[in-house]
Amino acid sequence: MAGKRSGWSRAALLQLLLGVNLVVMPPTQARSLRFVTLLYRHGDRSPVKTYPKDPYQEEEWPQGFGQLTKEGMLQHWELGQALRQRYHGFLNTSYHRQEVYVRSTDFDRTLMSAEANLAGLFPPNGMQRFNPNISWQPIPVHTVPITEDRLLKFPLGPCPRYEQLQNETRQTPEYQNESSRNAQFLDMVANETGLTDLTLETVWNVYDTLFCEQTHGLRLPPWASPQTMQRLSRLKDFSFRFLFGIYQQAEKARLQGGVLLAQIRKNLTLMATTSQLPKLLVYSAHDTTLVALQMALDVYNGEQAPYASCHIFELYQEDSGNFSVEMYFRNESDKAPWPLSLPGCPHRCPLQDFLRLTEPVVPKDWQQECQVASGPADTEVIVALAVCGSILFLLIVLLLTVLFRMQAQPPGYRHVADGEDHA
């Protein structure tokens, strides 16, 4: 009986200690989403330009060139709906201005894409409906003039060092081989389109025009066969790599996509330390913006970002209290976003590792790094000019000294003959 009582006493004691621990020790904090940054491309649009022999000129498009279409509006409304579902429980179901901030480039198509996206993300309900027949509410989208945009409009410029890198890229074997392989093809396209300045760097415009026309049911010219379109598409992707890679990718990143990455890093750090930003920060921009950022992160898949594609950064606070970053890319509307892993880090990347690994592609002083360093030839010119300038200065000093002494000398005496003044 004593042993039995002793057993019950030990069991009771363990339960008591467990109860005390539950009361004294705080419960473990569950992993939680703290902050989201989105960068998306605008939706379907009309061509940004056409070519001289194109039978479909600007009047063929209801709003002209470079404008968001109804298809593009729907694409972004659907993306907004998908984001609403993904972040249910994180964002309020109704719009609260303290929770979200949206910035766009100053183009009609990106501004309108952001507005369509917000219509899907935050449909009005209850008191937010200003008209019972309209399931929409105005939500602010911020922008700056194109000439002042140093965050979302790429490639950034003017930047002499970047232009120098591009000239050096043109001399690489990869660029030279690509140019040689496609010389006759580019001549054919130039002849069919009427363009006189077609290069590896500009041929994407032809593909873009034909792609937009084909997407909207317009008949392509006979020369634009499926094989030609496929080849144009490949050259279009090459032009993106030319802008931000192929040669000195890390330095190009510091001058281009690293500028945006620097702001994203700053925001992630700020939210991990002070929580002073909105829960959701949205950037509405272009395919070049996405490629510039993904090349800086070294996660670019080599293909043009499709309409309404979206790069996602999610900041989590782990149950340990530390923070981690997860990235996703939504480039297909009927599939879940693809997980992206920063090279050298798992998909759930600790924030400190994310910051450390991306540090090399973030500029310290963009204006300074954009300057072209003086080469040996430039140094010789500078020295020669300095020597010439010094010699000229000495000659001027010598000349002034002589003139000064001549003026300081007293006037000489002149003998006058007797009677000279008496004629």
UniProtKB/Swiss-Prot annotation:
Active-site residues (renumbered): H42, D287
Q: Which InterPro entries match?
A: Acid_Pase_AS, His_Pase_clade-2, His_PPase_superfam, Histidine_acid_phosphatase
Q: Which residue pairs form cystines in this protein?
A: C159-C370, C212-C310, C345-C349
Task: Quickly give the catalysed reaction.
Answer: a phosphate monoester + H2O = an alcohol + phosphate
* UniProt keyword annotation of Disulfide bond present: yes
Which stretches are Cytoplasmic in the membrane topology? 402-423
GO molecular function of the protein, one example? acid phosphatase activity
Query: What kind of modification does the protein receive after translation?
Result: The membrane-bound form is converted to the soluble form by sequential proteolytic processing. First, the C-terminal cytoplasmic tail is removed. Cleavage by a lysosomal protease releases the soluble form in the lysosome lumen.
According to the record, which residues are glycosylated?
A: N92, N133, N167, N177, N191, N267, N322, N331
EC class name: hydrolase
**Where mainly located?**
membrane
Q: Which GO terms describe its biological process?
A: lysosome organization; skeletal system development
One GO cellular component this record assigns the protein to is: lysosomal membrane
Recorded hits in PANTHER family, A to Z, give:
ACID PHOSPHATASE-RELATED, LYSOSOMAL ACID PHOSPHATASE
Into which family does the record put it? Belongs to the histidine acid phosphatase family.
Q: What is this protein called?
A: Lysosomal acid phosphatase
The gene designation is ACP2
